Amino acid sequence: MPAKGVIQEIIGVVIRAKFPEDEVPEIYNAIEIPLGNGDRLVCEVQQQLGNGVVKAVAMGSTDGLRRGLEVIDTGRPIAVPVGPATLGRVFNVLGDPIDGMGPIGPEVERRPIHRDPPSFEEQNTQAQIFETGIKVIDLIAPFTRGGKTAIFGGAGVGKTVVIQELIANIAKEQSGFSVFAGVGERSREGNDLIHEMKEARIDENTTVFDKTVMVFGQMNEPPGARLRVGLTALTMAEYFRDEGRDILLFIDNIFRFVQAGSEVSSLLGRMPSQVGYQPTLGTEMGELQERITSTKRGSITSMQAVYVPADDYTDPAPATVFSHLDATISLERSIAERAIFPAVDPLASTSRILDPNIVGEEHYRVAQEVKRVLQRYKDLKDIIAILGMEELSDEDKLTVQRARKIELFFSQPFTVAQQFTGRPGKYVPVKKTVESFARLLNGEGDHIPESFFYMQGDFDDVLAAYEASQK
């Protein structure tokens, strides 16, 4: 017989309920409030205050609730469906389908969203490059298979577009399963993403959407849902990993997870920490990030978009994410303003596996030389601004010309942006990327005007465009 209590107090999305003292729900248990119209409001227990009183965070709207309503303890945490039945479906934080394609049957396994991370013995630590088909990422900050990568950027510099392109590329080229968590972002973007994935075909009978699980807790949802939707998606991804698959987990946007935690923390009455964030910021982030890992059975490769408030990388939210990552992709507004997309800053982006023993001598050499040329150009910009190009040595003039071509060559037409740009998307394998930049550095493109390097695939595309213009 489940324990029953009554609502004592409602403050925003936080509900205080009283249970019999010998039947107090455990921390993280789901408690349900029947709403009379056949629906139920699920809340998650966050605090036990003594004398049978608990504080819980609602996963839905608290409109229409009142004191004295009955509360029922389910006796376990929120549990969500896992397995092949979830592919090609869209869920909310509770694991209920929101795509209008009918409910998930009772025969489908459900797992609690709170679980311990894999032990050290189970974890797999081998480093291996994960090809994305995006030149600037593969060359400068290669992803680790089974690693964690974050895409940092302020508002409107293209984080979501990069994430969408990665989903499309990986589904087409590597035919893997993906789990997408929309955390506190725009509902319109989520809707667009679903439609684009339904249109993007892997083959005649399969779309990208058919190989993806989507979980949404968007901007209009209460903070409880935005706080837990990442764990819901992660639980679904862990199932596929434990079945021996290599799975991709996309989280857009991890900052909104922190933001939701901050809202909940304030409503629970905790004293705020630095810059007004919750005192449990590091713990909450660790609980999520430590579960995103590879085991000896399978791997979870995660890509997370991180909104950087006011472009300030020292803000506690992005700074906390940094410590968990294998690679960081930094999107820069000044590059986006020049219409170079993806607007990745190659000098601020890093990867743990950009190592000659992992990516190979040639890749490492080319990447370092590209960085050296770009850094030299950056150093010379002040001189050029004051004295002009004429005052530079011949060697520096050549460096500047090549650096400008490299910057433009890092731009790339994306499949998901095709409808806006009118250019078909290009997937460039790592081998081609390294070869293309090696040719550029060797001087093979010195005679080609820099405009021909903009929005091209590999070096052969640049040559073809230039030769076509000469006819």
Swiss-Prot record:
It is found in: Cell membrane. Keywords: ATP synthesis, ATP-binding, Cell membrane, CF(1), Hydrogen ion transport, Ion transport, Membrane, Nucleotide-binding, Translocase, Transport. CDD domains: ATP-synt_F1_beta_C, ATP-synt_F1_beta_N, F1-ATPase_beta_CD. GO terms for molecular function: ATP binding; ATP hydrolysis activity; proton-transporting ATP synthase activity, rotational mechanism. One of its GO terms (cellular component) is proton-transporting ATP synthase complex. It is an enzyme of class 7 (translocase). It catalyses: ATP + H2O + 4 H(+)(in) = ADP + phosphate + 5 H(+)(out). It holds the Pfam family ATP-synt_ab_N. Its EC number is 7.1.2.2. InterPro entries: AAA+_ATPase, ATP-synt_VA_C, ATP_synth_F1_bsu, ATPase_a/bsu_AS, ATPase_alpha/beta_chains, ATPase_F1/V1/A1_a/bsu_N, ATPase_F1/V1/A1_a/bsu_N_sf, ATPase_F1/V1/A1_a/bsu_nucl-bd. Gene3D superfamilies: 2.40.10.170, Bovine Mitochondrial F1-atpase, Atp Synthase Beta Chain, Chain D, domain 3, P-loop containing nucleotide triphosphate hydrolases. ATP binds at G153, G154, A155, G156, V157, G158, K159, T160. It is a peripheral membrane protein. Produces ATP from ADP in the presence of a proton gradient across the membrane. The catalytic sites are hosted primarily by the beta subunits. F-type ATPases have 2 components, CF(1) - the catalytic core - and CF(0) - the membrane proton channel. CF(1) has five subunits: alpha(3), beta(3), gamma(1), delta(1), epsilon(1). CF(0) has four main subunits: a(1), b(1), b'(1) and c(9-12). Belongs to the ATPase alpha/beta chains family. This is ATP synthase subunit beta. It comes from Chloroflexus aurantiacus (strain ATCC 29366 / DSM 635 / J-10-fl).
